[in-house]
Amino acid sequence: MSEGKREKRLTQRVPVKLKVDWKAEGTFLYENATNISEHGIFVETNDPMDPGTMIDLQFTLPESNKQIAVLGEVTWANPLRPRKEANYNPGMGIRFVNLKEIDKETILSLIKRIAVL
């Protein structure tokens, strides 16, 4: 992290490879998620929704095969910029809005397992 920038995340995020179904504003897509925390998820997409957009998410956690359905809010977006040299990780950061406690516990369990590896 460069000097002057501070990490805003309050909890640990871990790398994952998940398929995520999401829908918002009449758009229905099936994308990949590359990291997750107890508070949110990063979804790779070349055409992310704008910050503030509410999104219905559905994904299955590895190992537990637990299916999670949750409302999320886009907190930041990094759209694909094909003509730019440095355009890493196009996608959007999504904060979970109404995550059930049981689902949060399942995600935390996954995070602990991955963090130990």
What is each stretch, according to the model?
Residues 19-51, 56, 91-93:
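Short strand-loop-strand
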Residues 59-61, 74, 96:
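Hydrophobic beta-strand positions in extracellular immunoglobulin-like domains
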Residues 33, 72-74:
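Conserved hydrophobic positions within beta-strands
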Residues 77-82:
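Short, conserved beta-turn/loop elements at beta-strand boundaries and strand-helix junctions
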Residues 83-117:
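C-terminal output/interaction extensions
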Residues 12, 48-51, 64-66, 85-89:
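A generic structural micro-feature
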Residues 15, 61-71:
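Short coil-to-beta-strand transition motifs
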Residues 1-38, 108-117:
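N-terminal helix initiation/capping motif
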